[in-house]
Amino acid sequence: MPYPKGHKLKVRNHIITSAAKAFRTHGVRNISLPHIMKGAGLTHGGFYSHFENKDQLVMETCHFAISDTIEMLQRIADKNKNEDQTSIEAVIDFYLSSLHRDQTEFGCILPALSGEISQLSEDIRQAYTQELRRFIAFITTMAGMNTDDGYALVSSMVGTVALARAVSDAKFSDDLLQAGRVQAKQMVNIGSR
């Protein structure tokens, strides 16, 4: 019996979703294709009917993961916006929170891959760069900032999360997040004038 129409696309998207969780948690080089396929509940042999190689999967996962992050942050901004807090402040509070730091499999892929991206293929680096630019545009627009200020804000946010995840001292990690939130909000208040 043949598979229903759209089955192959559904399986492909399921693999990308599984890969996004794995790459966010373990990085690209520390995770194998068999592990990704097992996480998706599939056999390794089926991978090549969906992707040419691991690099193609990583590139498509970067696009998916940033889309996922932007959608999540937009929902947070829409839900938490009130008279006392702007949309960008709600996004900063979440992005630089212990929840985002600790739930790596659902978090932003930018800090998750920042330490290894320069050592991956040029195609992957180009995909990461394209998605970083898209994320900067999203944050810059929400903050009402110019592009240079947006570069600084996103660099600060992504770097803070990467460092907060890297350190072994929980209080120090929390302090980094708190300082990052304060700094990011100051940048928004200065940059949006």
Give names to the regions the model predicted.
Residues 63-69:
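Short, basic, alpha-helical segments at the C-terminal edge of helix-turn-helix-like DNA-binding modules
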Residues 87-90, 101-129:
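Amphipathic alpha-helical segments used for helix-helix packing
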Residues 14, 22-56, 60:
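Helix-turn-helix
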Residues 60, 74-106:
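Hydrophobic alpha-helical connector segments
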Residues 91, 95, 110-114, 153-157:
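Short alpha-helical scaffolding segments that buttress acidic/His motifs in well-ordered protein cores
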Residues 122-130, 142-193:
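Hydrophobic/aromatic-rich alpha-helical bundle segments in the mid-to-C-terminal region
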Residues 1-8, 191-193:
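N-terminal intrinsically disordered/low-complexity leader segments
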